């Protein structure tokens, strides 16, 4: 699909019936709308031509041969003549046969069918959204129980039951069909009783996502208060924790539906899309035998059962209601097998006891459509190596080993050597590269400075699995990566490998610079949450950097750790050695960092740093812990985390804060980042 900015993109998610019709429907010159597959046939056994309205129908999917209709008439594709685009006899469009790779059809289901991915996969999205046990929903979907759901009509209901599930009275399942006549039971069933996937669809259609979000949040807060108080019963406390975890998942699911603007009722199918014929082919092999994709057989199974249900509903006045519900169950099972064979237990097999490959089997795993066909090809100008952390790199940079860089950029390097008259021809340039002369590395750095590279970590599950970086030459044999980009790749530094690709064309380089650079992909494309966040190594480093060594004036007057910047006196008290420290005073952060570089203080050693006058400190009502007077009349008011130096006239001369070198370094990094952002923002404006 193409968005409003003309960017090609792939979006996977529930689709509305209107969108499925828009994908498949075509209007013939006579006004007939085609696109629905109604027959379970593929090719005629005598003519070997696709059956009309079947799974390989040329009217729906396009011609088998370019420009030739089913009648055999030929017309030049793209001719400027005002000839009709469709054949008047067979209704086949005169287009290229490649249309059969993307032109879809659809099956209009006689009854709604739940999408098995959203019902049976764990966690079950439908069960979480409706707050119902999965076992009860399965009984409802597969017509094992009834549901007294909200009636379709707005008139008073027969039993005065609205918007609630009933599973307790199992005898109704047998008593109601026997009590009513067929016609009366049909009227009662359509008005009062909802069963199958239709009941799920009604419940999902009536669900307000914002109300679900608010109610779940209120319940989560109430359970949090109960958990703090405690019930005294371990079993009840465990139930509360499980319920809280469930509510968190339910709120996250509701947020995802709201952000992506997807209606929950789309998880129940009314129209079943039919894949293009070229993606589920029938091939003729030696001996005249045919080999068909398993998906064709599964589609035929769905159409057979769906047509049977349509006939039963057309004559429902003479058909028992239980027979109709049994056929609805068969349709639901056929749709489940098509989407994910074996997800409900025993998979469906053919006559040779071989399991059918469903749609899920075709696209998932290493041998699936995405990973094997689209993402699993080996290409030139690519390499692979282990990734390690690069703490000195910027967010948009990556460290590229020399051995990999000199191979990937060899073509550009040869061009640079010849252009700068270092080599007269390609042979001499290659010999200089093999000898690895110093001039080679200088030109290589110039080439890499203007050429981005692409890093990819398999499996590429979303677009952040491939990002662009500015390469930097490193001496190591591993690729150095900034730790902030690891979450987008779902990577860590325990032996993961990444592939390196070089974009060659100007269009690819422009796309890498404008769209794929790592500093331009800070938010998740799915839900909009920040994805470049500190994790693992960075969190541990920040913790060690800012933990300090017993910060606070009381804990630091006598410290068991060594202090290098002052004269220390060792005191023996109760067989423990204490060191009486002289406080370290620094006029600025530069003085503090200089003292650290000279190894006069440690990274976590507490010190007093002169700070700007802060009205919050001046107006504070905190009582000083200690007051120290000097011989000239000045005195120090020492508080827990700051110190005020006053003159004889009690005026504030300086304010010192209690901090460490780690805090100072962290603060300066944040300050420089904010200033750089403000400068860049003002430059853009």
UniProtKB/Swiss-Prot annotation:
UniProt cofactor(s): Mg(2+); Zn(2+)
A biological process from GO: DNA-templated transcription
Cofactor note: Binds 1 Mg(2+) ion per subunit.
Binding site for Mg(2+): 492, 494, 496
InterPro entries given in the database record: DNA-dir_RpoC_beta_prime, RNA_pol_asu, RNA_pol_N, RNA_pol_Rpb1_1, RNA_pol_Rpb1_3_sf, RNA_pol_Rpb1_clamp_domain, RNApol_RpoC1
PANTHER family documented for this protein: DNA-DIRECTED RNA POLYMERASE (PTHR19376), DNA-DIRECTED RNA POLYMERASE SUBUNIT BETA (PTHR19376:SF54)
Function: DNA-dependent RNA polymerase catalyzes the transcription of DNA into RNA using the four ribonucleoside triphosphates as substrates.
Entry protein name: DNA-directed RNA polymerase subunit beta'
Organism: Dioscorea elephantipes
Organism taxonomic ancestry: Eukaryota, Viridiplantae, Streptophyta, Embryophyta, Tracheophyta
């Amino acid at each position: 699909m193409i968005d409003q900015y003309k960017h090609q993109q792939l979006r996977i998610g529930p689709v509305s019936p209107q969108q499925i019709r828009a994908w498949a429907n075509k209007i013939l010159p006579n006004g007939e709308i085609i696109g629905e597959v109604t027959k379970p046939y593929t090719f005629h056994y005598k003519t070997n031509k696709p059956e009309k309205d079947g799974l390989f129908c040329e009217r729906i999917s396009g011609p088998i041969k370019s420009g030739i209709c089913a009648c055999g008439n030929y017309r030049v594709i793209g001719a400027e003549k005002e000839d009709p685009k469709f054949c008047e006899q067979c209704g086949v469009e005169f287009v290229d046969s490649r249309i059969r790779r993307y032109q879809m059809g659809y099956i209009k289901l006689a009854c709604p069918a739940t999408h098995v991915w959203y019902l049976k996969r764990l966690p079950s999205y439908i069960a979480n959204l409706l707050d119902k046990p999965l076992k009860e929903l399965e009984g409802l979907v597969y017509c094992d129980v009834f549901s007294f759901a909200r009636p379709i009509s707005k008139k008073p209901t027969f039993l005065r039951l609205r918007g609630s599930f009933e599973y307790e009275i199992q005898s109704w399942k047998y008593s109601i069909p026997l009590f009513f006549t067929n016609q009366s039971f049909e009227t009662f069933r359509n008005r009062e009783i909802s069963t199958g996937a239709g009941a799920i669809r009604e419940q999902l259609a009536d669900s307000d996502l914002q109300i679900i979000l608010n109610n779940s949040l209120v319940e989560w807060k109430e359970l949090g208060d109960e958990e703090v108080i405690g019930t005294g019963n371990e079993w009840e406390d465990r139930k509360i924790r499980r319920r809280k975890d469930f509510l968190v998942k339910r709120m996250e699911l509701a947020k995802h539906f709201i952000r992506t603007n997807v209606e929950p009722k789309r998880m129940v199918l009314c129209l079943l899309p039919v894949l293009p014929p070229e993606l589920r082919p029938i091939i003729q092999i030696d001996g005249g035998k045919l080999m068909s994709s398993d998906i064709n057989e599964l589609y035929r199974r769905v159409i057979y059962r769906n047509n049977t249900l349509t006939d039963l509903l057309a004559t429902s006045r003479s058909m028992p209601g239980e027979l109709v519900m049994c056929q609805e169950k068969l349709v639901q099972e056929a749709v489940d097998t098509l989407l994910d064979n074996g997800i409900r237990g025993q998979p469906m097999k053919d006559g040779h006891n071989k399991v059918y490959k469903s749609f899920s089997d075709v696209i998932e795993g290493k041998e699936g459509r995405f990973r094997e066909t689209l993402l699993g090809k080996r290409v030139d100008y690519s390499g692979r190596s282990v990734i390690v952390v690069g703490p000195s790199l910027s967010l948009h940079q990556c460290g590229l080993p020399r051995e990999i860089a000199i191979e990937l950029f060899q073509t550009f390097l040869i061009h640079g050597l010849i252009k700068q008259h270092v080599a007269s021809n390609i042979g001499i340039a290659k010999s200089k590269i093999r000898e690895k002369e110093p001039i080679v590395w200088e030109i290589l750095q110039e080439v890499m400075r203007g050429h981005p590279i692409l890093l990819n970590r398999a499996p590429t599950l979303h677009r952040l699995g491939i990002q662009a970086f500015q390469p930097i030459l490193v001496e190591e044999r591993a690729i150095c990566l900034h730790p902030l980009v690891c979450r987008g790749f779902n990577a860590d530094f325990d032996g993961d490998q990444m592939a390196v690709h070089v974009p060659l064309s100007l269009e690819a380089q422009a796309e890498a610079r404008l769209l794929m650079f790592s500093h331009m992909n800070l938010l998740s494309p799915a839900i909009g949450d920040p994805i470049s966040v500190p994790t693992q190594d960075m969190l541990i480093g920040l913790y060690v950097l800012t933990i300090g060594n017993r910060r606070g004036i009381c804990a630091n007057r006598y410290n068991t750790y060594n202090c290098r910047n002052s004269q220390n006196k060792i005191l023996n008290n109760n067989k423990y050695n204490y060191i009486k420290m002289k406080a370290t005073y620094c006029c600025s952060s530069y003085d503090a960092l200089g003292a650290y570089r000279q190894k006069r203080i440690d990274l976590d050693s507490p010190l007093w740093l002169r700070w700007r006058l802060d009205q919050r400190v001046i107006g504070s009502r905190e009582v000083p812990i200690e007051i120290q007077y000097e011989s000239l009349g000045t005195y120090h008011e020492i508080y827990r985390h700051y110190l005020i130096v006053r003159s004889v006239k009690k005026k504030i001369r300086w304010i010192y804060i209690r901090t460490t070198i780690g805090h100072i370094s962290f603060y300066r990094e944040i300050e420089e980042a904010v200033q750089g952002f403000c400068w860049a923002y003002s430059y853009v404006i």
